[in-house]
Amino acid sequence: MSLEGIGFGYRERAPYASNPAFSRGRLVPEPESPTRTPFQRDRDRIIHSTAFRRLKHKTQVFIAHEGDHYRTRLTHTIEVAQIARALARALRLDEDLAEAVALVHDFGHTPFGHTGEDALNERMENFGGFDHNAQSLRIVTKLEHRYADFDGLNLSWETLEGLVKHNGPLLGPYAAHPDIPVPQPILDFNARYDLELSRFASLEAQCAAIADDIAYNAHDIDDGLRAGLLTLESLDEVPLAKRLLDIVRTRYPNLDPVRTGHELVRRQITIMVEDVIEEAQRRLASARPGTMEDVHNQPRALVGFSDAMRAEEKVLKRFLFKNLYFHESVVVRRHAADRIVQDLFDACFTDPSLMPDEWRLGCEALDKAALARRVADYLAGMTDNYAVREHRRLFDRTPDLA
């Protein structure tokens, strides 16, 4: 693998990269900007949205108010965007599109992370379920109210298809999860604006997807060490982490544990990024796509870990699930968060007048399914802090998340 020239100066765009000059456009046509490409405008709209600001107070692993230095959805999103841009630059892709997809990929997450999503999905079981990826699409196509000419952000086709399919096709022979039904909100929007759900997304979207894995694999270690739920000694159980820690300990024999942990994290990010670049170059050389259309028609993703790194990453994930995500102290908080979300849903579904005016107006005309979706939209947009405050306002006792 050659890294020569990567990250320095101008490198010609690859023929299989997404080209903003040939964007498929937007659902609602708009005049082109004289100063920004369509993908740059998408990125800017995402950053200026209300949903983006809310990520600041939404959980990554630890409840947002547990400490100022733990990752939230916002800090995680920024880290994913940085890695996605680096990968796109190395592969001569459109960095702005990769960044836009990375910045928007977690918009649909509920308060309290996957716990909140599971709680809402349980309450929505008879009304189409709840899926954070589908909710991201609803936010950027309907729920953001900023522009006079349309609801949502009216993002370009390329950013929308990257958002929906960054983890792979949803339909057809190459579907990433063929046994899981496609969420109805995605199918409904796709009927209006065909995102080609059976084909792979752009390479830029694939960069955003693998950047997500790289970011949380490394940074959950960082947060786990900070919280005292993981130790450097326990990480010796993970072959990849042990190899990197051995390098750090040999080079810096007297380094304090905090800096040792940071050195592990930065090295893990680097080795994973370089693995993805090398593997993507190998797959591209084999597939020889000549255009972006060739990328969409591939039978597999072209950006991803090598088989060896994927195997090591699976070991790391098993370790994190056992020792961090299902640590007793994390599970206790998850039970409390689950109750908060389900209590709020039950209360608002039974009495929509408990919701703010913008959400309760018109509820009397909705059937049960539409009302449930309205309540889910309201709750999904909450931050951790707001959900706790609303629960305290409506209930005599609120579970302790401290």
From Swiss-Prot:
The keyword S-adenosyl-L-methionine does not apply. Gene3D superfamilies: Hypothetical protein af1432. Residues 73-217 form the HD domain. The keyword Cell division does not apply. One of its GO terms (molecular function) is dGTPase activity. InterPro entries: dGTPase (IPR006261), dGTPase-like (IPR050135), dNTPase_2 (IPR023023), HD/PDEase_dom (IPR003607), HD_domain (IPR006674), HDIG_dom (IPR006675), PHydrolase_assoc_dom (IPR026875). Residues 20-39 are annotated as: Disordered. Keywords: Hydrolase. Signal peptide: none annotated. One of its GO terms (biological process) is dGTP catabolic process. It comes from the Bacteria. This is Deoxyguanosinetriphosphate triphosphohydrolase-like protein.
